[in-house]
Amino acid sequence: MSRTAIIVEKVLPHGAEKIWRALTTQGMIAKWLMPNDFVPRVGHRFNFHTRPMGDWDGVVHCEVLACDPPRLLRYSWKGGSDADGSKVSRLDTDVTWTLTPVDGGTHVRMVHDGFMLPGNNIAYEAMSPGWGRVLDGIARAIAEAA
């Protein structure tokens, strides 16, 4: 098996503080990702909830691993199904957000790391384009909140 990551980055036309709020406020996160019980505190365990698919219950289990406002946020991202008994399709990954102020806004870099291929291939293929759309969703959520 090989380990791989999804990396998306974009300059958003907002300050780091506004983007940080979008990344760390439950209501804002629900607008661009999923309903959740997130709290920006290292060690906090939380869940994302979405529609179940196949053998997967629709719950992503997470824990805040690093939180350095308004620059860095990292959390574990675990879930998936091991209905086949092999555990190869279960996710045990991390998501890291890095915010860097630049002219005209903030450079946002998201790395979702730890996909073990080929076992996590279905999740990797589904999430790769999804994370790209998420950055636009964050920008929309910030604009709507203004």
Model-derived features: where do they sit?
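Conserved catalytic core of Hanks-type protein kinase domains
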Residues: 22-23, 67
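A conserved amphipathic terminal alpha-helix motif
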Residues: 114-146
